[in-house]
Amino acid sequence: MAPQSTKFALITGCGAGGIGEALILEYLRRGIHPIATLLPFESSEHLDKAGITWFKLDVTNEESVVQLKKDVSELTKGRLDFLVNNAGICYTMTAIDTDVKSVQRMFDVNLFGPMRMVHHFHDMLIASSGIIVNIGSIGGVVPFVYGSSYNASKAALAHWGNSLRVELAPLGVRVLVIISGEVGTNILKNDHGRTLPEGSYYSPMAEEFKNHVHRTPDAATDRFVYAKNVVGESLKKSPTTWFWTGSYSGVIRFLHTFFPKTVFDRWFSSLFNLAKLKEAHDAAMKKKVA
């Protein structure tokens, strides 16, 4: 049985190689008792080696969340100091070629998952005057090409967190939104096989799209450095509301704060070579007219 003075951190999405694993180890290093969650099919070897407490969880399944609460409550005697909503998935596709069912699945993980977690665990957080940490992204702020749906899920998470922060303040619970820049993880692995649909207006960009879904982010922040920053902020008595950390987060924060939103348009158009698409489209239109 853990002593009454023990603090507990519950982190979702702690598969090997991701941000969750790094967060778990950092909370452990800081003297917090971390509790990890894994998808039912994920290996626990990396957590077992570190002596981490873990439970299976599918954040899209109500019964799974309810069972997790029972298990965690039994372990912590009804207390929870940190709830870190980290579980997330990507969906990379052009906005007009989006498969809505795939996006609904992503929203179920990235947005409705945290909502389920807060709905079921809020009483334990209130009992401990705890903190909710929502892992967001610069994608929720900037028009990242081929990421419109993912961007939307992270924008929704951030702004849901804004209202959550105000509503929970009288109950003694803090809410911290992390605006994550590029971090070196394996989150893109499930997108490696994704291709543009046949007949897409973006077919001239097929090779660029393929390279994008197979990319290794340049100058990405090491996930353990990122975890150190995030955990450090969550341990503060009065953390900031939006905490920007990770590669490119500083410059994006500056531009987002002081410039019109269209400041990003030319940047991302150039970064993704959309001039090539325009040239191909213009040529195709001329051929139709001829």
Swiss-Prot record:
Protein residues bound to NADP(+): I11, T37, D58, N86, Y150, K154, V183, T185
Biological function: Short-chain dehydrogenase; part of the gene cluster that mediates the biosynthesis of sordarial, a salicylic aldehyde structurally related to the phytotoxin pyriculol. The most interesting aspect of this pathway is formation of an aromatic product from the highly reducing polyketide synthase srdA. SrdA synthesizes a reduced polyketide chain from one molecule of acetyl-CoA and five molecules of malonyl-CoA. The polyketide chain is then reductively released as an aldehyde.
Induction conditions: Expression is up-regulated during sexual development. Expression is also up-regulated during confrontation with the arthropod fungivore Drosophila melanogaster.
An MF annotation (GO) of this entry: triacylglycerol lipase activity
Pfam families membership: adh_short (PF00106)
Entry keyword RNA-binding: no
E.C. numbers: 1.1.1.-
Gene3D superfamilies (UniProt xref): NAD(P)-binding Rossmann-like Domain
Compartment(s) where it occurs, according to its Swiss-Prot or TrEMBL record: Membrane
Organism domain of life: Eukaryota
Biological process (GO), any one: triglyceride catabolic process
Catalytic residues (UniProt): Y150 (proton donor), K154 (lowers pka of active site tyr)
Membrane association type: Single-pass membrane protein
The protein's name: Short-chain dehydrogenase srdE
Gene: srdE
GO cellular component: endoplasmic reticulum; lipid droplet; membrane
Matching PROSITE patterns: ADH_SHORT (PS00061)
Glycosylation sites: N151
Main localization category: membrane
Keywords: Glycoprotein, Membrane, NADP, Oxidoreductase, Transmembrane, Transmembrane helix
Residue spans crossing the bilayer: 125-145
Similarity comment: family membership: Belongs to the short-chain dehydrogenases/reductases (SDR) family.
Source organism phylogeny: Eukaryota, Fungi, Dikarya, Ascomycota, Pezizomycotina
